[in-house]
Each structure stands twice: as structure tokens, then as C-alpha cells.
Amino acid sequence: DDHSFYDQYNSIDKLNNVVLVYKDGLVVACGAVKEYSPGVMEVKRMYTRPEFRGQKIASKVLQELEKWSLELGYHTCILETGRRQEEAVGLYQHTGYTIIPNYGQYQDVAYSLCFEKKLIL
């Protein structure tokens, strides 16, 4: 099962840097970053409720996560998404992420696609 594989790497107890977007008291989008290695943050748990997609909310969440990473002294963000997640792939490419070889636990996962972005001050 795809979910059980990913769930082991997405425990919320390891996510201390989280961005939440509220509309009328409801969380409509989220994202997080956690240290992957010195100087490198990994973007995790990007999600926008379906009825709020297409409003550039995810782009704003990603911008905040990148800004936060820079403020914390990191120079690069990496992330993984599913190859079939066309909206996510488009978001990451549109916001300056480039495809990289699958890293870490995703190295041999055919349905994973990994990205990287060098952050600019």
C-alpha cells in the first residue's frame, strides 16, 4: 500500500516548522519543512483542500516555507511527490524546482519524483 510506505516518513512529531492557511476558521492548506541534512530542508505535507485549489494558495505556502528555511540558515529545499500528482508536479516546476535523482528512502520508488530548489537571499 502506497500510504503505509509514505506514512512512516511523515510523522507529525518530527515537523516543527509548519504553515497553515485558514479561511473562515477552517484550515484549507498546509505545508511543512524539516531538516534533511546540514543546509538542506525537506518540504513535507503540502496539501490544499480540493475546493480551494486553483487560487495559488499552495504557491504562497511554498514561498513561506522557503522564506522560513532561509531565515533558519538553509540554502536548499528538496521534496518528493508522486509522479501521478500532476498538479503538484506543475506547482513545483512553476516555482523553480528542478527534478533530481530520487534521494534517501525514495531512491528505488518508481512512482516518486524528487525536486530541488536552491534558495536565493
Residue spans for each PLM region:
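Conserved catalytic-core motifs of GNAT/GCN5-like acyltransferases
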Residues: 78-81, 89, 93-114
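Conserved acetyl-CoA-binding loop-helix of GNAT-fold acetyltransferases
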Residues: 48, 54-67, 94
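Short coil/turn segments at alpha/beta junctions that flank glycine-rich nucleotide-binding fingerprints
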Residues: 39, 55, 71-75
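Conserved short alpha-helix immediately C-terminal to the canonical SAM/SAH-binding motif I
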Residues: 61, 85-88
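Acetyl-CoA-dependent GNAT
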Residues: 1-44, 49-50, 62-64, 102-105, ...
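Conserved GNAT acetyl-CoA-binding A-motif
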Residues: 62, 69-81
